[in-house]
Amino acid sequence: MIKNQIIQNIKKLKSDFSTNYSIKTKTEIFTEKLFYTLFDGNALLDESIEELEILFKEISSIACKKPNPICDSIWDKYLATLPTVLEKLNQDAAYILKNDPASNNLEEVYLAYPGFYAIAIYRLSHELYELDLLLFSRLMSEYAHRITGTDIHAGAKIASPFFIDHATGIVIGETTVIEKNVKIYQGVTLGALSITKEMKNTKRHPTVEEDVCIYANATILGGNTTIGKGSIVGGNSWVTKSIPANSIVTNTTTTEVKVKEKK
């Protein structure tokens, strides 16, 4: 009797839920399959693309809020973006190889770099975002977030080439704009200065111009904040105002070192 009552209570509380949880699992499978298709030299493209199309349409049937004929046509639009996305990702990988002394070859970047994986899934999810498949894109980017510890919103606009090193703890908000040849290290936040629901559809996150390097744990906030071309933002810096081109931003907190006295 108690069990039946509990079940009825749960049903009542769930009565307004329309969530189809399978979309999350399907998106994760799609994401891995898509990455494999683009970067595994042994992938059979014809078969892989067909499998991806089936998965995509299953997901979009849940995620797409438009009439069915429009939803069904989105796959062709998404597929058409993949060569351009792959070209950008190859540029990203080459830029990582060029700038990271610990890297040995492109194969290592493709297989072992969480920063590259985070960039790849960002670029692939961004195209979904542009096609207004917002839930699909969010689930894809959150999967990469879970795998790499890097949170890049699919709505951000990031030029190529782009370099992320170590990846862990990086946050890049929805309205961030990053120009080409930018390097970012672990723990960097490109975020909003304040958050209210009324700020939706406004520029809330920074702009980073080309040839900028942002070192570990720097925090840059605000939609009106621009990091000028060629600047360097030092580790642990806190930036809420624009800085001009070719600036060097440093955290002035000093670290004191003392030698312990021998007893």
Where do the protein language model's features map onto the residues?
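Terminal amphipathic alpha-helical/low-complexity segments used for targeting or macromolecular assembly
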Residues: 1-142, 263
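Extended hydrophobic/aromatic segments used for targeting, binding, or gating
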Residues: 197-203
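Left-handed beta-helix
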Residues: 148, 153-154, 159-160, 165-174, ...
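Short, conserved active-site entrance elements at the starts or edges of catalytic domains
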Residues: 130-160
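Residue-level signal for pocket-adjacent positions within structured domains
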Residues: 104-106, 145-147, 234
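Non-transmembrane, interaction-prone segments in cytosolic or luminal domains
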Residues: 108-109, 143, 151, 227
